[in-house]
Amino acid sequence: MRIAIDIMGGDFAPKMNIEGAILAAKELENVKLILVGDETHAKPFLKENLPNIQLLHTSEIITAHDDPVSSVRRKKNSSLVIAGKLIREGKADAMVSAGNTGALVAMGILIIGRVQGFERPALAQLIPTYDGNDVLVLDLGANIDAKPENLIQYAKMGSIYVNKMKGVTNPRIGLLNVGTEKGKGNELVRTTYNMLLKEELNFVGNVEARDVLKGHCDVIICDAFSGNILLKSFEGVIETFFSLFKKQVNKNLITKVATLALLPTLRSFKKKMDYREFGGAPLLGIKGVCIKSHGSSNSTAIKNAINQAQKLVANNYINFIK
């Protein structure tokens, strides 16, 4: 198995990408990792000579400020584009990038190609729920201006994903909305609701944002605008919770001592809700395994994203969705 890593993408590139790849290479000894990027920037961080790591030099970088579509077409020797070409040419089985989301989606469509029957790809993420399981939420950032037909396709992609990757039979599909009643929401969600009723899917109705983590659904679909706000709200709430908790703990000796008993539970909870532990968001609907990592990913997040890519390839997900 071969996994390409766009080492020039993300806020802390290439350092964190390379360090994450080294961590993954030690865990996945039978997987070849192809580090795609500028060798001048990369070599100072390649301090270990591992047999399953290869550096592939590229001379261009797609930045966070570049226009997604034009940069993919113009910067043909960028790390992101070359990583995508490796998949298209059968030289890599998967790729990981923490770079420009729009460019990643454009690359997925223009270079790797869409799966027949799916008009638009979607970024998906498994989010922990109260009952200890996960809910797959999509789209989280690939297609801001979605149509009802796109959301129906997301439901089908998500259903296949949780069935094949998690073994969930007849996955429950929910539609993110401002209320649970039929007829709630804007035209997009109302039309999608009525269309879902006619599909051979286990559609359980509308789901409000406050109920996403309650485990009532296996898959929740939404447009990328709503999904991205939902995901970043979760991240912000968790970060704020622990910041406020830390301030309260340090108020006096009693709270400090009491907190010692809670530390194992708090650490476990924080780890479970930490986006760095999730790995990344697979771009579903394209003809290859492509994982989008958080832009501010550290080495642990990159390592977990690579592990996630390896599992998707090992489980033959692409052939199932085709």
Describe the function of each predicted region.
Residues 13-15, 28, 32-34, 39-40, ...:
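Glycine-rich phosphate/diphosphate-binding loop of Rossmann-like nucleotide-binding domains
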Residues 13-18, 76-84, 88-90, 94-108, ...:
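Short glycine/serine/threonine-rich phosphate/pyrophosphate-binding segments
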Residues 109-123, 129-133, 137, 216-220, ...:
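Glycine-rich phosphate/nucleotide-binding loop
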Residues 1-4:
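Extreme N-terminal starter segment of soluble prokaryotic enzymes
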Residues 6, 35-36, 56, 97-99, ...:
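Short beta-strand segments
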Residues 50-92:
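Phosphate/nucleotide-donor binding subsite
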Residues 13-66:
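N-terminal glycine-rich anion-binding loop in soluble enzyme alpha/beta folds
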